[in-house]
Regions:
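Conserved catalytic-core segment of nucleotide-activated headgroup transferases in glycan assembly
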Residues: 190-246
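A charged, aromatic-enriched C-terminal amphipathic alpha-helix characteristic of glycosyltransferases
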Residues: 30, 339-372
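Membrane-proximal helix-turn-helix segments that form the acceptor-binding/catalytic region
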Residues: 99-111, 130-150
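Nucleotide-activated donor-binding/catalytic signature segment of Leloir-type glycosyltransferases, i.e.
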Residues: 243-269
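Conserved acidic donor-binding segment of nucleotide-sugar-dependent glycosyltransferases
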Residues: 316-328, 336-342
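Short acidic/histidine- and often glycine-rich active-site loop of Leloir-type glycosyltransferases
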Residues: 297, 306-321
Length: 379
């Protein structure tokens, strides 16, 4: 795959920006997808976004930094949007490389913004985990201090290391990792008599897999026992590996099961558009969960767990969340959505509105332009 891609051109761009990424994640890279969709939206607004990488893992730090010094010669008038996750810049979660790269760019006089895909340090257990967490918090603060602008993917008020009302930090939510959906996507399954479809994204590896499958079964079986014809779509990482456990869990339940594995974005979009609800049991639903944003973009009701985390503006979408671990409440919430077409359509409408006004890529691209031309606090 070409690691440097230009967004589609629509005439002569008025500005040229660079999205700078670290190590590529496998088998899919959500940050690269984010930059690609952002670039497509920016192109329609006159900004050409070029994607570049510091491939320190494949080439070693010395060679990767040398190539960066050569490539950055053409970036003098550009905004550099450095994409931060801890493991994109470090093998073991000590991302000093991100600071090194930012320092090189700043010493060359380039305008640099850091896009925080992980604006909070990852929590770790034990002595090493505690040191790693403290290290990441320090690096997060230093990246913010040394950059010209910080773009947070969570509301700034929820980030405890960030000074309140910091004028250099802005909140811009992530967008969906799928192509733009049709303007109208109704409740197709209910109209053509097919079973109602519940989409489930990803299944974690053991030891979490058994609990997740128990939660999924506990949520859908009561609705099936009430006579609702059901189909479950399993897609994403881990679903093929869990094929035997999934089939055993739903054997002789009368529920149709499809295990799709990893899907390219267009097929993922189509699968979501054909679904009637998205069920999320891999922890609490939170603002930076790309699957939830994709579900919102496709106008889906989202049923899942919640904790005390502030998830605004995702809370504006069609969510039915219950306390984390409350399996009976999860089953009731899903049954309500599947049984009541009026409720389902109301939740669909809320998700569609939230997508149009908050999570659509054209809205996000406009927010970037406003932030980088007239800095102001949005969180």
């Amino acid at each position: 795959m070409n690691l440097r891609r230009d967004a589609p051109k629509t005439g002569v761009p008025t500005e040229r920006w660079v999205a700078l990424l670290g190590h590529r994640d496998f088998p899919t890279d959500g940050v690269e997808d984010y930059c690609r969709y952002l670039g497509e939206a920016l192109a329609l607004q006159g900004v050409l976004l070029r994607i570049a990488r510091v491939d320190w893992m494949g080439e070693g730090w010395l060679r990767a930094l040398w190539k960066l010094r050569l490539e950055r010669a053409g970036w003098n008038s550009s905004w550099i949007l450095m994409q931060y996750t801890a493991l994109a810049w470090s093998r073991r979660g000590f991302p000093f490389g991100a600071l090194l790269v930012l320092g090189i760019l700043r010493r060359q006089g380039l305008r640099c913004a850091v896009v925080y895909h992980e604006p909070i340090a990852l929590k770790g257990a034990g002595l090493i985990g505690g040191i790693r967490t403290a290290c990441q918090r320090w690096i997060l603060r230093e990246l913010h201090r040394q950059s010209d602008m910080s773009v947070m993917t969570a509301p700034t008020r929820t980030i405890d290391w960030l000074p309140q009302e910091d004028s250099k930090a802005v909140f811009i939510p992530i967008g969906p990792n799928i192509p733009a959906p049709p303007a109208a996507n109704g409740d197709g399954a209910a109209k053509n008599g097919k079973p109602l479809t519940v989409a489930v994204y990803c299944v974690d590896p053991p030891p979490y897999r058994e609990r997740e499958l128990q939660d999924i079964a506990g949520a859908v079986l009561p609705a099936a026992k009430q006579g609702t014809p059901l189909r479950i779509l399993f897609f994403g990482k881990g679903t093929v590996d869990a094929k035997d456990e999934i089939e055993q869990t739903f054997h002789q339940t009368g529920i149709e099961v499809s295990i799709l594995g990893l899907l390219e974005p267009g097929k993922l979009q189509q699968s979501l558009l054909e679904s009637d609800a998205l069920l999320s049991v891999r922890g609490a639903v939170y603002l930076r969960r790309g699957t939830a944003i994709a579900g919102v973009a496709c106008g889906l009701p989202i049923v899942g767990y919640a904790d005390e985390t502030d998830i605004f503006p995702l809370s504006e979408a069609g969510l039915r969340l219950v306390p984390r671990g409350d399996q009976p409440a999860l089953a009731r919430a899903l049954a309500d959505v599947l049984r009541d077409p009026n409720l389902r359509e109301d939740l669909r409408a809320r998700s569609r509105r939230a997508h149009r006004s908050i999570f659509a890529w054209d809205v996000i691209a406009k927010s970037f332009q406003e932030a980088l031309t007239k800095p102001r606090a949005l969180g």
